[in-house]
A protein has these predicted regions:
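Glycine-rich portal/gate segments that line the openings of hydrophobic small-molecule binding cavities
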Residues: 1-30, 34-39, 70-71, 94, ...
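Hydrophobic ligand-binding cavity/cleft-lining segments
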Residues: 1-9, 14-21, 26, 30, ...
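Membrane-water interface at transmembrane helix exits
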Residues: 23-31, 51-52, 56, 61, ...
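Beta-strand/loop substructures that line and gate deep hydrophobic ligand-binding cavities in soluble
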Residues: 34-39, 43, 47-52, 57-58, ...
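A conserved amphipathic terminal alpha-helix motif
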Residues: 67-89, 93, 236-275
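Short, surface-exposed charged micro-motifs
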Residues: 121, 184, 217-219
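Short strand-connecting beta-turns/loops that link adjacent beta-strands
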Residues: 127, 177-178, 190-191, 223-227
């Protein structure tokens, strides 16, 4: 997906669909059945994934995420072509291809590279002061990752280091496999809010060119009953399309990152709180 993001090539739905349509035109004299068309589409998908791995150096997680969409897109184009090249005159068929190609190539011009945010919250049975002391930096998270993509190899948070509790303090959010997000504190309200900008992301193949994380934030709400609501947010921009598909995965991943960190904060805050 990195190459698609950097070069601004068409959506990973439209481009494979066009590929499937062209393939069905090439296959038309063979008159393949629907089953053979599906099998041929599977081979096309596997070849595309191998190309992504060896030519564009895409990560395994990225390829796993994109593979269902790629297969369905190629298959949709191939099945549409199977009907088109059976039913309509040759001249009409060929006149449609330039129009479809124009639509695919012009699709990137319609994109809005807007910023998105994902927010999660948990309840902690400890006062805000106890939670805050565990928030600004923390040691290695002892719990093994639960999210299946983390276990499959996607980098996950393991610790955070901070230069101090003040604005402009440098932070490091340390992920597995040596991935480090460098951050800078831009807003700090003791016992209430911590906001930091992400100034440098790791050059991980699962991340580069796919999305840009901009900033993160923790907000503490004192519930006046000895408990605290911890709210974690991340702002980001996606560089791959279709947005609805990749945003689904991105939000799912960010939510798993948030909850892994916040659940460890809760564990440490509640342990330090006498019962």
């Amino acid at each position: 997906m990195d190459a698609y993001g950097r070069l601004g090539l068409p959506s990973l739905f439209l481009a494979p669909s066009l590929g499937g349509l062209v393939a069905s035109y090439i296959w038309r004299t063979l008159k393949p059945t629907i089953g053979i068309t599906c099998l041929n589409t599977l081979w096309m998908t596997l070849l595309a994934l191998l190309g992504g791995a060896f030519v564009f150096h895409e990560g395994v997680i990225c390829l796993a995420i994109v593979s269902p969409l790629f297969f369905i897109s190629v298959l949709a184009g191939a099945l549409f072509g199977r009907i088109l090249f059976k039913t309509y005159p040759t001249r009409l068929r060929l006149s449609l291809l330039p129009l479809l190609l124009l639509g695919v190539l012009s699709e990137p011009l319609t994109r809005d590279a807007g910023e998105s945010v994902i927010t999660d919250e948990i309840l902690i049975h400890a006062p805000a002061a106890k939670v805050w002391s565990q928030l600004t930096s923390f040691p290695e998270i002892p719990a093994p990752p639960r999210f299946w993509l983390f276990r499959f190899g996607l980098p996950y948070p393991v610790a955070t280091a901070s230069a101090g509790d003040f604005v402009n303090a440098e932070r490091q959010c340390i992920f597995s496999h040596g991935a480090i997000f460098k951050e800078r504190v831009v807003e700090l309200v003791p016992l209430a809010k911590l906001t930091f900008e992400i100034v440098e992301s790791p050059q991980d193949p699962e991340l580069v060119g796919h999305l840009t994380p901009h900033r993160g934030q923790f907000v503490l709400h004192d519930n006046s009953d000895g408990t605290t609501t911890l709210i974690g947010s991340t702002w980001y921009t996606l560089h791959v399309r279709p947005l609805w598909y990749f945003n689904f995965w991105t939000q799912h991943i960010f939510r798993s990152v948030h909850l892994r960190v916040m659940e460890d904060i809760r564990r440490r805050a509640e342990i330090s709180e006498p019962h």
